[in-house]
Amino acid sequence: MADGDSGSERGGGGPGSFQPAPRGGGGPGGEQETQELASKRLDIQNKRFYLDVKQNAKGRFLKIAEVGAGGSKSRLTLSMAVAAEFRDSLGDFIEHYAQLGPSSPEQLAAGAEEGGGPRRALKSEFLVRENRKYYLDLKENQRGRFLRIRQTVNRGGGGFGGGPGPGGLQSGQTIALPAQGLIEFRDALAKLIDDYGGEDDELAGGPGGGAGGPGGGLYGELPEGTSITVDSKRFFFDVGCNKYGVFLRVSEVKPSYRNAITVPFKAWGKFGGAFCRYADEMKEIQERQRDKLYERRGGGSGGGDESEGEEVDED
């Protein structure tokens, strides 16, 4: 199904409507076509946003479309794993936006002198997954504050949503989400992820997930992703499956950068053993260092006690 054929963009449903779609095959060759599983429409200020969960032979993914007042459209494509990370990032932007005070007249005047364009970003993050990058910038202009989301695609094969063939280079796509609608948008996204983001099809790499197929359908169930926060860093653990087997993607995220490694399932035991061994060794090292510190601190006072005791015995 082409992007323009999205059920929600064809006008189905009113503002805030939720439309689950039939999940059956689409006739001959239906397994190779894109199926629409659900649609959600949001009206925020003078814009319409459509969130469509779709599925094709490569897996399940999310299409986000922005339709402006003049009918112009911009679209982003996210795998369900990236959509979950995007949902978490939206939570960070919502918290940051809530802490911002109103813009001063001087700031708005400065923006007007610069041609009314957006000032520097109030907060920025980016996500990287395979050949796609997503840049998130909370910005401000005379019309207010908004979250600009830009997607770029590097050279390589077509992604979840199709697009140019192998070796093609897609131009960047950008949507601008008014800050007042961040919570509503995040909640709608979270509902779609909860309903469609953790099933076999998305993890198995294709509809139906047949046993032993190239999409890795032997694994009908995989562990859920999780994350931990340490100081200013967040670590995401996402289990996935492709034609090569099951893997764990570990992503390290800071405000200024993001890095990730992929660990195949057959190496998990070795990685886990190495982590446990280093944790035990560091615990022993820390205990030895504490013992030495206590000895140095208590050595002088202990010696003084013994001398005082000897003097008492002599008396």
Swiss-Prot record:
Compositionally biased intervals (Gly residues): 205-219
Gene Ontology terms: cellular component: nucleus
Tissue: Expressed in muscle cells and in the liver.
Skewed-composition ranges (Acidic residues): 305-315
SMART domains: PUR (SM00712)
Pfam families: PurA
InterPro entries associated with the record: PUR-bd_fam
Region Disordered, annotated ranges: 1-39, 200-220, 288-315
Intracellular or extracellular location(s): Nucleus
Modified residues (Phosphoserine): S6, S8, S104, S301, S307
Residues with PTM Omega-N-methylarginine: R23, R155, R297
Keywords per UniProt: Acetylation, Activator, DNA-binding, Methylation, Nucleus, Phosphoprotein, Repressor, Transcription, Transcription regulation
Domain of life, per lineage: Eukaryota
GO BP annotation list: negative regulation of DNA-templated transcription; negative regulation of transcription by RNA polymerase II; positive regulation of transcription by RNA polymerase II; regulation of transcription by RNA polymerase II
Main location group: nucleus
Ranges annotated as biased composition (Basic and acidic residues): 288-298
Gene Ontology molecular function, alphabetical: DNA-binding transcription factor activity; DNA-binding transcription factor activity, RNA polymerase II-specific; DNA-binding transcription factor binding; DNA-binding transcription repressor activity, RNA polymerase II-specific; double-stranded DNA binding; mRNA binding; mRNA regulatory element binding translation repressor activity; purine-rich negative regulatory element binding
N6-acetyllysine found at: K270
Listed Gene3D superfamilies: 3.10.450.700, 3.30.2450.30
Induction and repression of expression: Induced in the liver 48 hours after tetrachloromethane (CCL4) administration.
Similarity comment: Belongs to the PUR DNA-binding protein family.
Assembly behavior: Homodimer, heterodimer with PURA and heterotrimer with PURA and YBX1/Y-box protein 1. Interacts with MYOCD and SRF.
Functional note: Transcriptional regulator which can act as an activator or a repressor. Represses the transcription of ACTA2 in fibroblasts and smooth muscle cells via its ability to interact with the purine-rich strand of a MCAT- containing element in the 5' flanking region of the gene. Represses the transcription of MYOCD, capable of repressing all isoforms of MYOCD but the magnitude of the repressive effects is most notable for the SMC- specific isoforms.
Name this polypeptide is given: Transcriptional regulator protein Pur-beta
Organism placement in taxonomy: Eukaryota, Metazoa, Chordata, Craniata, Vertebrata
